[in-house]
Curated annotation (Swiss-Prot):
A molecular function (GO) term: zinc ion binding
Record's subcellular location: Cytoplasm
Annotated pathway: Amino-acid biosynthesis; L-histidine biosynthesis; L-histidine from 5-phospho-alpha-D-ribose 1-diphosphate: step 3/9
Protein name (Swiss-Prot/TrEMBL): Phosphoribosyl-AMP cyclohydrolase
Native species: Cereibacter sphaeroides (strain ATCC 17025 / ATH 2.4.3) (Rhodobacter sphaeroides)
Amino-acid positions noted as binding Mg(2+) in the UniProt annotation, renumbered to this chain: D77, D79, D81
GO cellular component, one term: cytoplasm
Magnesium listed as a keyword: yes
Lineage: Bacteria, Pseudomonadati, Pseudomonadota, Alphaproteobacteria, Rhodobacterales
Family recorded in the similarity comment: Belongs to the PRA-CH family.
Length: 119
């Protein structure tokens, strides 16, 4: 059965959350938003394209930084309202130059940063 991005369940803004995960290690790298066109562009090019809510424009991950995300596999959750992008990440995924955007943990009631920026 052919996949149609319109078959996903989008929110009122026409967006669906997309979680980027390293395909080899399983590490969760980031979460961003996609609309139907971003999903289609990602599938067509193999380069992950998100929708920037602040800029109201497409955002090809790594287009300016060189820290690209290559799509290995796109997975859809059971409600069709969230995507899991299995990717190959080149360089850091986070704009803070960390491998993952999830670099702060709450441990024993206190926030603790456990990932340093990549050199």
């Amino acid at each position: 059965m052919a996949f149609d991005p319109a078959s996903l369940t989008y929110d009122a803004r026409g967006l669906v959350p997309a979680i980027a995960q390293d395909h080899a290690t399983g590490e969760v790298l980031m979460m961003a938003w996609m609309n139907a066109e971003a999903v289609a562009r990602t599938l067509e090019t193999g380069r992950v394209t998100y929708w920037s809510r602040s800029r109201q424009s497409f955002w090809v991950k790594g287009e300016t930084s060189g820290h690209i995300q290559r799509l290995v596999e796109l997975r859809i959750d059971c409600d069709r309202d969230c995507l899991l992008l299995l990717i190959e990440q080149v360089g850091p995924a986070c704009h803070t130059h960390r491998r993952s955007c999830f670099y702060t943990a709450v441990r024993e009631g206190a926030e603790q940063v456990f990932l340093d920026p990549m050199g």
